């Protein structure tokens, strides 16, 4: 059994080195090209999908669409879920990473970005960019919508969807594509690879590159590689 992850192509805020999180930004020109190249590469290598899962953020949805279109599979059903959203960076969202490091220190920013269980400063629910004001999340209980997350909380958000939707799809024989975000994919990788809390800090997932997992019947990883 195989599973393919792809982190969205470079976004406009990736290009500007800004914290993005749940803020909804578009792909950059480079990001559009990365997604198209990924789709072509998947086609060249014979990858076909029966179902695709993505987030409710534009950059991941657009990447998913382009990948499927470029691999002649735009007909493949897509399921969009907030549970695959990027980690919510709280008050850091929209801030320049370099300027934030100059203000708080490199080590503090590194901990905010990479630590497994350290929360960023939380965003006020009344903030104009709060997810509580976004109709994408209007169906969710207020106490479920985050104001800031660490990777631990992100994993707790993503895992129920893995167990309820993604894993059963794989086990039923479906060929699965997950088009999501750096930290939601890191959270899934931590779970399926059994990565420790310490080692997950060093895991980077590049934009727009298909990551293939070969899995056994218990969804244990046999092999992992980038196309």
Curated annotation (Swiss-Prot):
Family: Belongs to the phosphoglycerate mutase family. BPG-dependent PGAM subfamily.
Positions of the record's site feature: Transition state stabilizer: 181
GO MF assignments: phosphoglycerate mutase activity
Active site: 8, 86
Keyword Signal set for record: no
Pathway membership: Carbohydrate degradation; glycolysis; pyruvate from D-glyceraldehyde 3-phosphate: step 3/5
Assembly behavior: Homodimer.
Top-rank lineage group of the source organism: Bacteria
Keywords: Gluconeogenesis, Glycolysis, Isomerase
Cross-referenced InterPro entries: His_Pase_superF_clade-1 (IPR013078), His_PPase_superfam (IPR029033), Phosphogly_mut1 (IPR005952)
EC number(s) per entry: 5.4.2.11
Residues reported in the UniProt entry to bind substrate: 7-14, 20-21, 59, 86-89, 97, 113-114, 182-183
Organism of derivation: Neisseria meningitidis serogroup C (strain 053442)
Entry-linked Gene3D superfamilies: Phosphoglycerate mutase-like
Role played: Catalyzes the interconversion of 2-phosphoglycerate and 3-phosphoglycerate.
Name the record gives this protein: 2,3-bisphosphoglycerate-dependent phosphoglycerate mutase
Pfam families, per database record: His_Phos_1
NCBIfam families, alphabetized: pgm_1, PRK14115.1, PRK14118.1
Record's catalysed reaction(s): (2R)-2-phosphoglycerate = (2R)-3-phosphoglycerate
Signal peptide coordinates: none
């Amino acid at each position: 059994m195989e599973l393919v992850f792809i982190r969205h192509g470079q976004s406009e805020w990736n290009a500007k080195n800004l914290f993005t999180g749940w803020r909804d930004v578009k792909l950059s020109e480079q990001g559009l090209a990365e997604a198209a190249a990924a789709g072509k590469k998947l086609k060249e290598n014979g990858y076909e999908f029966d179902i695709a899962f993505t987030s409710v953020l534009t950059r991941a949805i657009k990447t998913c669409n382009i990948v499927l279109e470029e691999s002649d599979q735009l007909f493949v059903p897509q399921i969009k879920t907030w549970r695959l959203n990027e980690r919510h960076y709280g008050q850091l969202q929209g801030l320049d990473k370099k300027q934030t490091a100059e203000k708080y220190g490199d080590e503090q920013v590194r901990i905010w970005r990479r630590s497994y269980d350290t929360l960023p400063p939380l965003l006020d629910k009344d903030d104009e960019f709060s997810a509580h004001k976004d109709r994408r999340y209007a169906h969710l209980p207020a106490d479920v919508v985050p104001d800031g997350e660490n990777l631990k909380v992100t994993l707790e958000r993503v895992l129920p969807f893995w167990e309820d939707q993604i894993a059963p799809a794989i086990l039923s024989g479906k060929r699965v594509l997950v088009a999501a975000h750096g930290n939601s994919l890191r959270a899934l990788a931590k779970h399926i690879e059994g990565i420790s809390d310490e080692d997950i800090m060093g895991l980077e997932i590049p934009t727009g590159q298909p990551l293939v997992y070969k899995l056994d019947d218990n969804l244990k990883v046999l092999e992992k590689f980038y196309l």
